[in-house]
């Protein structure tokens, strides 16, 4: 499928509990307000790419694959196509992801599948947080104790 909006995706990538929401708040204030004042409703402008909504087209192509998007060997076959099908209102869209930009090789298909490529990606921010802080943040989320 031809990409009508080359270089249209701005990626916000991170390991879970690394400050993704905080960066989304900053980006939302910059890109989605006229005055830079943050409002929590703005966070809806930056959603997770790997949510099912970006793969709705699969319902008419292959319903079994749509039902199994939680499997890496299924979803990886459709990453690029899903990105090419994205409809945007402005110049770009921002998506958050916890996925890595890597090739996934399928033995059964004898083929590599890439998460994204330079023809689709406008920019990216990769958030890196001290792993010790990630563990504490995750423990707080789960109301547990880190020893």
Predicted regions and their residues:
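PAPS-dependent sulfotransferase catalytic domain
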Residues: 1-147
């Amino acid at each position: 499928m031809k990409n009508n909006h080359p270089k249209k995706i701005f990626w916000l990538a991170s390991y879970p509990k690394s400050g993704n929401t905080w960066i989304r708040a900053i980006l939302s204030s910059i890109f989605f307000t006229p005055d830079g004042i943050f409002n929590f409703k703005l966070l809806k402008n930056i959603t997770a790419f790997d949510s099912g909504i970006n793969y709705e087209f699969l319902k008419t192509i292959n319903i079994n694959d749509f039902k199994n998007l939680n499997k890496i060997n299924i979803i990886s076959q459709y990453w690029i196509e899903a990105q090419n099908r994205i409809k945007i209102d402005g110049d770009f869209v921002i998506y958050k992801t916890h996925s890595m930009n890597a090739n996934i090789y399928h033995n059964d298909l004898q083929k590599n599948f890439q998460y994204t490529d330079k023809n689709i990606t406008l920019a990216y921010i990769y958030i890196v947080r001290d792993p010790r802080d990630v563990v504490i943040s995750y423990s707080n989320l789960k109301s547990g104790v880190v020893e």
